[in-house]
UniProtKB/Swiss-Prot annotation:
Interacts with major capsid protein L1. Interacts with E2; this interaction inhibits E2 transcriptional activity but not the DNA replication function E2. Interacts with host GADD45GIP1. Interacts with host HSPA8; this interaction is required for L2 nuclear translocation. Interacts with host importins KPNB2 and KPNB3. Forms a complex with importin alpha2-beta1 heterodimers via interaction with the importin alpha2 adapter. Interacts with host DYNLT1; this interaction is essential for virus intracellular transport during entry. It comes from the Viruses. One of its GO terms (molecular function) is structural molecule activity. GO terms for cellular component: host cell; host cell endosome; host cell Golgi apparatus; host cell nucleus; viral capsid. This is Minor capsid protein L2. Its main location: virion. Minor protein of the capsid that localizes along the inner surface of the virion, within the central cavities beneath the L1 pentamers. Plays a role in capsid stabilization through interaction with the major capsid protein L1. Once the virion enters the host cell, L2 escorts the genomic DNA into the nucleus by promoting escape from the endosomal compartments and traffic through the host Golgi network. Belongs to the papillomaviridae L2 protein family. Keywords: Capsid protein, Cytoplasmic inwards viral transport, Disulfide bond, DNA-binding, Host endosome, Host Golgi apparatus, Host nucleus, Host-virus interaction, Late protein, Microtubular inwards viral transport, Phosphoprotein, Viral penetration into host nucleus, Virion, Virus entry into host cell. Highly phosphorylated.
Amino acid sequence: MSPRAKRRKRASPTDLYRTCKQAGTCPPDIIPRVEQDTLADRILKWGSLGVFFGGLGIGTGSGTGGRTGYIPVGTRPTTVVDVGLAPRPPVVIEPVGASEPSIVNLVEDSSIINAGSSHPTFTGTGGFEVTTSTVTDPAVLDITPSGNGVQVSSSSFVNPLFTDPAIIEAPQAGEVTGHVLVSTATSGSHGFEEIPMQTFATSGGDGGEPISSTPVPGVRRVAGPRLYSRANQQVRVRDPAFIDRPADLVTFDNPVYDPEETIIFQHPGLHEPPDPDFLDIVSLHRPALTSTRQGTVRFSRLGRRATLRTRSGKQIGARVHFYHDISPVAPEELEMEPLLPPTSEPLYDIYAESDFLQPLDSDVPAAPRGTLSLADTAVSASTASTLRGATTVPLSGGVDVPVYTGPDIDPSVGPGMGPLVPVIPAIPSSVYIVGGDYYLLPSYVLWPKRRKRVHYFFADGYVAA
């Protein structure tokens, strides 16, 4: 018996209607159900033409009884019906026609207007007297200036921005305060305000002055290469050939290259570069000029080592930052003058050999105490040894030379070595115990039973005499 095929569920009528309506491939029961054109729907449509059921909800709806639902006969609905607000009565407008009279008072009532005080009347006597006269001759005006000389006027304006004043006069107190607008030059004491001036830039200083001009606003600085990251090994190059001939430090050959571009090196299997810092370097990138915190210019190049090589031929290595500091101009050195007076004794080096050092007398007997044994050079002392307590002895040998401090001492009168007498020690070499019993200290007796085994000593008790 063959297995029964699994029944697949058909899609909903709504989904089938959307896809098959336009193509015309819908099943016969899909279109009447979606468009509500079944036999039951037609009976309800025909019956509703002659029967009206109101809001009972009898029809093709959900059968909930309409808005208020189904309630028992003789009871009130449990829901509250919102009846809303009562409408306001309309405002009655009385139209006024053109035939109806309109009374407008054109003359105002004069009883409400104050007439004011009476005007004074002039009788012509008293007050000002006005004299009138009539002149018939024309008026002649003399506009010729007095004198026969020519008058010339000149004005000059001094711009302090372009003219250096020869004499500067301090302003008065009123001109400084700003309350007096016009003033004249007067003699005597003047009040003025002193403003301290600040020097912004000098030609030579201690290095704290600005090294660049005021930056232009809106200029965006271009990010430089990251030379001091953790991924780069820092190597300082002291050879100045690194600036113009970096290839000479990597290989003995001098390939044709552009110093402003990246230099690629091809090394044999075993090679030794002229500079050991450039071992296994296969490429040097273009140079970069930066500044350090000390104000010097630093010449830098990034390189790559080929330390490992895989089977596929790929080279793996670390990145190296080679840099060379361009030293600034060295400051001028001043010759130092000696500060000691010319009459003072010169200082001598005990390690230096001088021509004016005189050899010591080899017949001087050696002292039994404080003997200094020197090696392999002639013993000599300077002429400054005549001073009390000052003797210059170089590190030389060949003869045992006594060295003394303090005043001059004659070696022949030095103390001699007498016979040594042994001293009997006061502490006895053996211990004698006089008594019969030995008692342990109470602190050791009262210990608990479970204790660590402790070795007792003779000093942990006492002897009964």
